[in-house]
Regions:
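Short helix-initiation/N-cap motifs at beta->coil->alpha
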Residues: 1-8
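Ligand-binding "clamshell"
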Residues: 10-17, 26-39, 44
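Short secondary-structure boundary segments
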Residues: 21-23, 53
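Short, low-complexity, polar/charged sequence segments that are solvent-exposed and flexible
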Residues: 36-40, 53-55, 67-70
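A bilobed periplasmic-binding-protein/Venus flytrap-type ligand-binding module shared by bacterial periplasmic
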Residues: 44-57
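Ligand-binding clefts/hinges and TM-proximal coupling segments of bilobed small-molecule sensing domains
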Residues: 58-100
Length: 100
């Protein structure tokens, strides 16, 4: 099932619990909450940069500035701007970069 559909099914009461992504904007958009995985069942999710090796010299500086720059909560808020407020990813990311 599409992850966005599972969030909507959870919100509507069709499901009681789902496995999702901690940075999904739909958590905020649909006023849901994240349970703590105190038994560490799910492995940690780490976002990584992926690029072609011939572009690394151009991108390494930008990647360095972005590394560890966004918390889970902030990423969720940014995703909410796209998922909940229907803004474009380019607009949201552009504002975030300018705010740094």
């Amino acid at each position: 099932m599409d992850l966005s559909l599972t969030y909507r099914a959870l919100q509507s009461g069709e499901l009681d619990i789902i496995a999702g992504n901690s940075t999904d904007g739909l958590i905020s958009a649909l006023d849901l909450f994240q349970l703590e995985d105190d038994r560490r069942y799910f492995p940690p999710y780490q976002a990584v940069f992926i690029a072609r090796s011939d572009k690394m010299s151009v991108l390494s500086g930008a990647f360095g500035r972005l590394s560890n720059a966004i918390s889970t909560e902030e990423m969720r808020r940014l995703n909410y701007e796209v998922d909940g407020n229907k803004r474009t990813p380019r607009e949201v990311a552009g504002e975030w970069v300018k705010s740094r």
